[in-house]
Regions:
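Intrinsically disordered, low-complexity segments enriched in Ser/Pro/Gly/Ala and basic residues
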Residues: 9, 26, 31, 104, ...
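Detector for outer-membrane/organellar transmembrane beta-barrel domains
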Residues: 244-253
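Polar low-complexity intrinsically disordered regions enriched in Ser/Thr and small residues
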Residues: 8-10, 14, 40, 90, ...
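Solvent-exposed loop segments that connect transmembrane elements
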Residues: 96-101, 218-230
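N-terminal periplasmic/intermembrane-space "pro-region" immediately following the signal or transit peptide
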Residues: 13-85
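Bacterial N-terminal signal peptides
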Residues: 1-8
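Outer membrane beta-barrel
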Residues: 64-93, 103-217, 231-232, 236, ...
Length: 253
């Protein structure tokens, strides 16, 4: 798998530069006029998606003159190759439900390559008196029909609220294991939706969230069975307890 990150850097020509760099993996280098860039680095890091296939914080960003707002432009190029020795699935992703039964016609051996999961994103972060830390994020890859660009995320987040198109509140992104296969492990809960969500941390290690989401219904239809229009939104909610940075338990419904 080949990963490539790209970014751009801008700074006032006559301003005194302060270079701010953290030492963590996938760290950020920020050039600004003063130490206000520390807040930008913190917000970029704290708002990263924990999902393995999502891009991390951009290493280079564009900032305003005071270093209070920053726009990250980045992504990665990813290519995978696979060889199927037993005709398991005629798809670039692995879905156990697509494994054919005996007697069906299928190619026993197959070689495939795919680069459609390569991702591009824009991330605007900042901090204001009334909104606190805020994030405006949009990302997409080329998983649309005929390999066209497809929106994956587009939302704004502030004061615990998230509005836009994002992963469902029902999902636990931090619980998804790393995988080469973009589809992820069998049986995982995975859903994106247009939503309005509110999340808040409280107590020691506790966090809860509730959302209003656009429902998406999928099923098998025929001449006698069809899917009707949805009259009500979904109302997912969760509560989570974490005893350290890498361990937690969550109940969602």
């Amino acid at each position: 798998v080949l990963l490539l990150g790209m970014g751009f850097l801008s700074a006032p020509a006559k301003a005194q530069k302060v270079v701010i760099e953290d030492d963590a993996p996938n760290s950020i280098v920020l050039v600004s006029q003063d130490k206000a860039g520390d807040e930008i680095v913190r917000i970029m890091n704290e708002t990263q998606s924990p999902r393995f296939h999502d891009p991390k914080a951009p290493r280079f960003v564009l900032t305003d003159r005071k270093g209070r707002f920053a726009l990250g432009i980045g992504g990665y190029v990813k290519a995978t190759a696979e060889y199927d020795f037993g005709g398991i699935s005629d798809d670039v992703d692995f879905y156990p439900s697509m494994i054919p039964n005996g007697g069906q016609n299928y190619v026993r051996n197959q070689f495939q390559m795919d680069a459609t999961t390569s991702t591009i994103f824009l991330k605007l972060v900042g901090r204001t008196k009334h909104l606190g830390d805020f994030v405006v994020y949009t990302a997409g890859n080329f998983r649309g029909g005929s390999k066209v660009f497809e929106l994956q995320n587009a939302y704004v987040s502030f004061l615990g609220f998230t509005m836009g198109y994002d992963y469902s509140t029902f999902m636990d992104l931090a619980a998804l294991p790393p995988s080469i296969d973009y589809a992820g492990p069998a049986g995982q809960v995975f859903s994106r939706a247009t939503l309005l969500r509110y999340e808040r941390a409280f107590g020691k290690g506790w966090k809860a969230g509730v959302g209003i989401e656009m429902p998406v219904v999928d099923g098998i239809t025929n001449q006698s069975v069809n899917i009707s229009n949805q009259r009500m939104p979904n109302f997912p909610a969760y509560i989570q307890y974490a005893w350290n940075k890498s361990s937690h338990i969550r109940v969602a419904g």
